[in-house]
From Swiss-Prot:
Domain of life: Bacteria
Location of the region described as Disordered in the Swiss-Prot/TrEMBL record: 29-357
GO molecular function, one term: translation initiation factor activity
Main location: cytoplasm
Protein name, UniProt field: Translation initiation factor IF-2
Gene giving rise to this polypeptide: infB
Amino acid sequence: MSKKRLYEIAKEVGVESKVIVAKAQELGLSVKSHSSSVEEADANRITSSLKAGTAKDESKPAPKATPTPKEEKVEPKVDKASVAKSAPAKETSKAEVKEASVALKKPKSRNFKAEREARAKAEAERRKNGGGRDNRNRNQQGNDQGKRHNNDRRNQKGNGQGDHNKGNRDNSTNHDRNFQGKLRNDQNQNNRRDNARNNQAGPRIDLKARAAALKAEQNAEYSRQSETRFREEKAAEQRRAKEQEKARKEKQQAEVAVQKAAAETKPAPKPAPVAPQSAPTAQVQDTRRKKVRPNKSRDNRRVNEDGPKQTRNNKWNNQNQVRNQRNSNWNKNKNKKGKNNRGNSAPKPVTERKFHELPKEFEYTEGMTVAEIAKRIKREPAEIVKKLFMMGVMATQNQSLDGDTIELLMVDYGIEATKKEEVDNADIERFFVDEDYLNKDAMVERAPVVTIMGHVDHGKTTLLDTLRNSRVATGEAGGITQHIGAYQIEEGGKKITFLDTPGHAAFTSMRARGASVTDITVLIVAADDGVMPQTIEAINHSKAAGVPIIVAINKIDKPDANPERVIGELAEHGVISTAWGGDSEFVEISAKFGQNIEELLETILLVAEVEELKADPTVRAIGTVIEARLDKGKGAVATLLVQQGTLNVQDPIVVGNTFGRVRAMTNDLGRRIKTAGPSAPVSITGLNEAPMAGDHFAVYEDEKAARAAGEERAKRALMKQRQQTHRVSLDNLFDTLKAGEMKTVNVIIKADVQGSVEALAASLLKIDVEGVRVNVVHSAVGAINESDITLAEASDAVVIGFNVRPTPQARQQAETDEVEIRLHSIIYKVIEEIEDAMKGMLDPEFEEKIIGEAVIRETFKVSKVGTIGGFMVTNGKITRDSSARVIRDGVVIFDGKLASLKHYKDDVKEVGNAQEGGLTIENYNDIKVDDVIEAYIMEEIKR
């Protein structure tokens, strides 16, 4: 009997796969997932049970809506009086609930209710004794009397000195009485406090508990005194403000009176009466000046009969004198500006420092100064310096303190100290590991990132080419993929992002990077070749990254294809098919003819649905660099894969050890876009330098922060590189001496993309030839320039160009300085050539000789022929039997042979300098205007 997969049954019935899995498990079938297979009879049982359950649900009648009984609608009769009585209770309960909620919101503080009850109890005892009442009455009488005298003196303008002194004596007498009453009250209060402490004192049982109680009592006492002092200062400040306001109003009234008097005296016809009118004023001024100043000094030194000298009344005396002086207009030069009139204005009252409560928590950083701590806890630096001195720490207000000292200081103040965690702004990795960076409520489904991996020439690029309906594979030199590419396709309304990784052994690091950012791995295995070394390596990378594997057995159209052998070989390496009880999906395809491609895409979407891939598009974008290169006109170009967030044009970005702003952004089709969401591959420009492939990137809030982070990362990378020094030890002494005797092959590597530079350098360093080693003097991205030739001449190195060409100036300088330039487009040929040269087996029988260059001026597409390029020879000549390279923007696009060469309509063997002609190239039709055609021949060298 045939078997069926559970997801096929789900498609037939029209339900989700998980429903079928649950029903199968309910029927007792041993299934694990939607990919499990069952017999046809079991499939019929599952289908019939599902249909029976659906029919049973439909047969159930819909529940009728039960009408609300009428008794519930009838409102009961309620007594209005009872309602009126219950209303205040409800209001009271609401108020109590409100007060309780407010009390819960407030921070825990002292028990003011208990303190009020204690004060009320003490007041009742004082009233019962009667002593406090007499003092209060006497104080009140003295205050009233002093107020009456002071008011009388304020209302009288220009009175004599005798009345003024009388008012001062009355005030001083009243103040003496107030002072004596206050002394008695303080004494009673101290007695009550001592009695209370004596009553509370008990036998000491636990020293720690007693110490804690004493400390709590001291804190409570300190809080009470602080609050009392704060209230007294606030009341005194309010009194001073009222007095100043009153003095200001009196001054305004006096000025208005003077202006009225001046207005009345102005229209007098004769100036003679004016002198007698001002004479008494001057006389009063002179007498006032003579009387006031000596009396003022005597009053300050006077000792009262009832007690010691009192200083509070002097404030009232001084204010009265200032008012009298203003009213009498005795200082005529008061309003004049000058050096001698600075002290004429009344001194401003000194504002006392406000009292602030100590904070309950204090967040500190290592190295805070005493002044910073004092500002944070609202205390004087001198107070903190004193506390530190008592703790045995000598410090000034500008001295930094360590964390332990700050914590001890906060314990002394009774404040909970916590250390502030310093956030490294230059650390990009924190965005990838911090769970709080993403908003879980804003998570949406994202497209899966699929990496196509496999051995060399097993059909990875051909499969991707079939998926994209393009011809990427035909443009690859030697038929292998040189660097990673990212593309996005759409299947059934859902997008899938594909990463194409190279299969050559030199690109191990690039495959590892591809596996680290992927969600699903599609392992391509040729049905005729089976499992190869890079296939095993791809399996290990996928297992290390923890991503599911979908095996695509390719080339099933070949006669010698054996898919069963491939399944058995993969099972030996831990990749077991679901048909054999494993968890890996196997799909047999033919990438060349497009066979079973739809089934492969459906399997990818099915596995992605099981993985439940989510992303937050609302945060700032983070992701990974897929590839980076230097473009002649655009500068540094980086291919990025957005993993979280949304990337926008003009975003400040930090990529690896460089930074910049996103100037332009294009998708995989070359179209300019403004935004890119999660799982989208984009190519951006605007970076200062080309980053390394595999670096992480993150978008920052502004360009200033991005610049600071990028410069800091570059500085750290440089310091790390400088610290990598090779120290001589006994273990490596022999190796060091041996290395001095070895011959060295110095090379300079220039490639088109960063990934190829890394792979080529790593492969050359791995070449193991006894007595010879490779030293990579310099490696970079871009065309070969004059500085590379200069460096090669100084270090006696060979310049290796991978998919790049030297500039004309560099080529001329290389010929002058006799520097060897090796140009290649296939990586294993570079490795073989360097290895043969190191072994002394290189046989330089032929040398490449460039015979001419031409520029494409126009292109013509002819059916059954291809693209014809109309060219003009700019240097040398183009021959029919020569090989040709297509160079675009300094990068080799294609290398092949000429298919035809014509001058006008005639077939010719060569076209000379400054002549025009037409040509076609074998197996290449992507000729464009301004492409450079470089013709060369392989010439035998005399040994």
